[in-house]
Amino acid sequence: MNLLQNRILNITEEFRRGTFTQRCSQLSFGILCLFLLECSITGGGRYWEVGPVSIRILLGGLAAVLALPELFRHLGAYLKKPAVWLTLAFVAWLAFCAWRGVRAENRMDVLITDIKGFMWLFLVPVSVAVVRSRDRLRTLLSWVLAGALIQAALILAVNAAVVLMDDPAPLCRWLNEHTVGIVDVVSARLVRVFFKSSPYMIVGCVVALFRQARAPKLRWRYVLAVALLFNALLLSYTRSLYGALGLTALISIIAVLVLCPEGRKRTLAFLLAAVVCFGVLVTVQEFALEGSYLSFAVSRTIGKEVPTSWASQLRSQLRGEDPGDSPNNGEMDSQRSYIEVTEKSDQLRQETKDSLNVYIQRSPIIGCGLGASAANRDKGVDEYFYLDMLARTGVVGLLLYMLPFGYVVVWCLRRRELLRECPEGAAVVCGLCTFWIVTWFN
């Protein structure tokens, strides 16, 4: 406690003695941490709004405004950074595509949504300006990890609450209406809980993995953290998240083994311990809430019914039930119906692809402008981000969008020795891979 108080006093004194620009930079960084914490927890961030302004827009705007003194102070140097001027080039192309969308009389509501969707780009210059040290980067990642763990705990709590409550409809409705996430009651014992911030839980796993790799011994807090995140991701029953988790894990594990060779054995022990703890956690849940989570996750992923998981079978044996007894017919019928809905969703996705391909073929190089939307989507939500980009901004727009991240990856590959000293940078790159993979389907 005294250590924490001393740390707060030191930060306060440092802030008091700093110049105006330094103070603004410190405040911007602090608000940026809160911004990412909020992003890591609350989905669309619309649980509190005043008109068009949400808490997320407020925090992001404050972080950007307070970063301006630092940006203007070294504007020439920042503009020479490829990540910054490549981002500015993409913003300029977006403005051109917005003009094309207005001229082509594309859907104005979709066009406005497109513009809002790219407002996060302001984070690039803000981060470049205020995250200028390894300590700040590490602190920022700590806030992301904390937010991911809070989100995971909330998902487990919502899952249990919906199963145990007599009338979970108000809770589900509130979460859906405020775009925190999707809560679908699959059956009496199974609930799909998908928060829109779920990709941050994969980023949390990456952060924990890299920190464990640098630790002198096995850190059980990281093991339990990853097990909790795995459990929450399982309850999403979302194929894109499962795929993103698998591919990001592969990339991150390879990066850790290359950059931190001295910690390879601890890393492998960490992964094994995390999987075991995840299995124990899921087993306890299946016993307590009587749901077969693992088998339904596999069923929804492959689109076919599979036998109940080993945890459910063990539960039946311990309760003295006949292992050969068939599961509750009503329960299984509900699960089958949900899998059928998934199949219909796949058909809708294929129709969306076909509709977007029409736009792409019409103008593959420069796109058809912002606001171009698949005809079979009344709300304009197309789900396929990269096809959206090709349809609306063309090949030029997609390349400009990918270039800043591509530059960062190349920069990291050419400076592997530096990353060995600062693995947080590699953690950021691996974490960004999560969003690249998830947005392929969403």
Residue ranges and their predicted role:
Residues L36-V50, L235, Y384-T393, E424-N442:
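Membrane helix-loop boundary segments at the extracytoplasmic
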Residues V256-E340, V358-R362:
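A membrane-periplasm/extracellular boundary helix in multi-pass inner-membrane enzymes
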Residues M1-A98, V102, D135-R138, S142, ...:
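Transmembrane signal-anchor hairpin modules in multi-pass inner-membrane enzymes, especially those
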Residues N329-V396:
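Long extracytoplasmic/lumenal interhelical loops at the membrane interface
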Residues G30-E38, W220, L224-L229, W411-N442:
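Loop-to-helix entry and N-terminal half of a specific, functionally important transmembrane alpha helix
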Residues S40-Y47, R173-V191, G369-A391:
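Juxtamembrane membrane-water interface segments that cap and precede transmembrane helices
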Residues R138-R173, A188-C260, V282-V284, Y407:
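Alpha-helical transmembrane segments of multi-pass inner-membrane proteins
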